[in-house]
Amino acid sequence: LLTCSPGKEVWAQYGHTAIRYYDKESGEDLAINYGIFSLDQTYFIPRFVLGMTDYRMGVQPMDIFLAQYSYEGRGVIEQVLNLSAEDKEVIYEALQENMKPKNVVYRYNYFFDNCTTRARDMLINHLHGKVVYPPAEEDATFRSMIHKWNNKYEWAQFGEDLLLGVNADRKTTKSEQQFLPENLRSDFDKASYNGKPLVKETNVLLAAENKVAEPAFPLSPLSIALIFAAISLVMMLLSYRRQQVYWAWDLALMLTSGLMGIIFFIMIFSQHPCVSLN
């Protein structure tokens, strides 16, 4: 199991998960990645918002995979799994089947079917035994878990909080908590398989660069809200004292609230399970 540290882009703020397949005899060394997408896809942004985005499985040489993450300054941790030859053969055959063109595309879901859960299921679902994980974090919700990772990105957190509904605040199961790469890595590290540790050894393939997250916009959502409230108060007092209607300001208010209403209305039809009930 490969666990990659977070990146700067919004879609990389929570890290990434991949599978490494290494055959010592043949020298074949591959990274299997379930997080391939293209912003050039037709209507990518609207489809992503509505939960209709298709991701795909990708396979590339391990050295190219590492070179990409090295260029981005992101770390990669490898966990070598303690599997039997039979387990490895079954997983290899399952990967070969998954690599067929008819099987590489899947409907992405941020919480329940993403690059991390796909990698986990490919490994765990093809083992000849039971994997035992540590107990689930009792009070963890989807919202609280992502807040741990985007607390330095206030606008990303604000946008997600704006869209996520009540289903994001329910308690989660152990399986659901593994949608985050670091959660899965930690669980694998503490898990047992047929009475033995699931992870045989852990290697740091790339060390993450310690970069301080810089806000994309200098003002926080709270700052903008306070400024907006102050301006609204001033405009209200001016309108009252001068007995004058400021049409431009009223128009801006109506357009802003109207656009927000349209967005919330559209999200009713989103296929994201934690968004529609907002």
Locations of regions flagged by a protein language model:
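Catalytic-site beta-strand/loop segments enriched in glycine and acidic/polar residues
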Residues: L1-L2, L95-M99
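Extracellular structured ligand-interaction cores
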Residues: H16, D29, E78-V80, T116
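Short, exposed beta-strand "edge-strand" segments with a Pro/Gly-rich flavor and a Y/T-containing core
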Residues: V76-L83, A216-F217, P273
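A structural motif
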Residues: L83-Q96
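Activation targets extended, charge/polar-rich intrinsically disordered C-terminal tails
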Residues: E97-N278
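Glycine-rich catalytic cores of cysteine/serine-nucleophile enzymes that process amide/ester linkages
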Residues: L1-G73
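Second-shell loop/turn segments in exported
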Residues: G7-K8, R74-N82, P101-Y110
